[in-house]
Amino acid sequence: MGSSNSKRQQQGLLKLWRGLRGKPGADWVLLSDPLIGQSSTVQEECGKALKKSWGKGKMTPDGRRLQEGDTFDEWDDDEEEVGFPVQPRVPLRQMTYKLAVDFSHFLKSKGGLDGIYYSERREKILNLYALNEWGIIDDWQAYSPGPGIRYPRVFGFCFKLVPVDLHEEARNCERHCLMHPAQMGEDPDGIDHGEVLVWKFDPKLAVEYRPDMFKDMHEHAKR
C-alpha cells in the first residue's frame, strides 16, 4: 500500500498533467500519462481523490467557499482560471541551480512538460505547481528574447522554448486552427514574432553556463 505522501504526489502530478493538456491538441508530440506504470489501484484512488481533495479549501469564482459535498468541477467554469491549494504544501524557497536541475529531471521523468505548446496559461500552471508542490517562489520562469530558441534565464532549468511548424492537420483544418492551443499562445517576451513554441528538454542546459544569459536571473524574471 502506498503512503499518503505518495498518493498526494500522484494527485499533484495528475493535476499538472491535466492542466497543461487542458484543451485538445496540447501536445506537439504524443506524451505518456504520468500514471502509466502505476498500479490500477493507485490510478483509481487518484481519480476518486480529484473530485474530493481538490475541492477542500477552494473558493468558487464568485467568492463562495466550497462546502462539503461540492466538487470543484461544478464551479470551474472559467477555462482561464488555474486552481491549486490556497497555501503551499512545503516551505518557500528561491530557485537554485540544484533545485532547477532536480525539478527539470522530475518533470522530464513524469512526461509533464516536454513537447507541450507554450502559452501564458500553461506557464502560470507550471509556476503554481512549482510553488505549491516544491515551494519554489514564482520569480524563476523567464526566457531569453526571440525570435528563435528561447533559453531559460535560470541556470539549471533544462527546458527551452523551441519554434516548431504546426502539424499538417493544424494548418489545413479551419476548425482545428481556430481552437488549437498553439494559435492562442503568446510569446514569453511579449513580442509577436509569429512563432509557435513548445517546451523541449535539453540536459546540456545544466552544464553550459553563459554568464550573459543567467546574470541577475531573479531581477529579470520580476520585470
Swiss-Prot record:
Annotated spans, Acidic:
73-81
Q: Does the keyword Membrane apply?
A: yes
Q: Name the membrane topology term.
A: Lipid-anchor
Give me the residues lipidated as N-myristoyl glycine: 2
List, alphabetically, the Gene3D superfamilies matched: Nef Regulatory Factor
Q: Domain of life, per the record?
A: Viruses
**Domain description from the entry?**
The N-terminal domain is composed of the N-myristoyl glycine and of a cluster of positively charged amino acids. It is required for inner plasma membrane targeting of Nef.
Further information in the entry reads: This is an African green monkey isolate.
Q: How is this protein named in the record?
A: Protein Nef
Q: Which organism is it from?
A: Simian immunodeficiency virus agm.grivet (isolate AGM gr-1)
